A protein has these predicted regions:
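Cysteine-based protein phosphatase catalytic domain of the PTP/DSP
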Residues: 32-123, 138-171
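Short, well-ordered beta-to-alpha junction loops that form the rim of enzyme active sites
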Residues: 125-127
Length: 171
């Protein structure tokens, strides 16, 4: 998809999301900007932030772009509908142990896709800053041997709106 087509598709999806949720991810970002791990000046949450050559993080709008580009899309936001290959809602209210089990399933699915296909994996939640970030952090920890600190730093380097929610999985 060329940049003009991507921009048009992104604008169209933002309009649909505005109608359904009464705000776009960009508008929500303005409200919660100060929680981010790095400066978010000029950052577009609708972009896919590539953690490495096969794993990306994005918001709901970016999920539509990721699907259109043929990527394997994982939706971790129970409240959103998107063109995804799997939907595995991540809810921190279920408690740390149950959430770690959910994260294990997501990481296992990511690993399976990476090992058995040539597709890129894109994980999204509504904003692309909490649940999707934690999913990718957990994958990096579980399958690439990164510490939680190192994994969060890797993600924050490419997605400055990332919010550290390791407390959700604390024992």
């Amino acid at each position: 998809m060329n940049s003009t087509a991507r921009r048009t598709a992104t604008d169209d999806v933002n309009k649909l999301i505005q109608r359904r949720y009464s705000e776009t991810p960009r508008e929500r970002l303005d409200y919660i900007n100060h929680f981010s791990m790095a400066s978010t000046d000029g950052f577009n949450p609708d972009e896919i932030s590539w953690v490495n050559d096969r794993i990306g993080v994005t918001d709901l709008v970016g999920a539509f772009v990721a699907a259109a580009e043929g990527n394997f899309v994982i939706n971790v936001a129970g409240e959103t509908d998107s063109p995804c290959d799997i939907k595995e809602p991540e809810d921190p209210r279920i408690g740390p142990e149950a959430l770690r089990e959910t994260l294990d399933r997501i990481a296992d699915e990511m690993h399976n896709v990476i090992e058995t296909t040539d597709k890129k994996v894109v994980v999204h939640c509504y904003m692309g800053m909490e649940r999707s970030v934690l999913s990718v952090v957990w994958y990096l920890h579980r399958y690439e041997g990164k510490t939680i600190d190192a994994a969060y730093q890797i993600v924050a380097n490419v997605r400055p709106i990332a919010i550290d929610h390791r407390s959700w999985i604390a024992t």
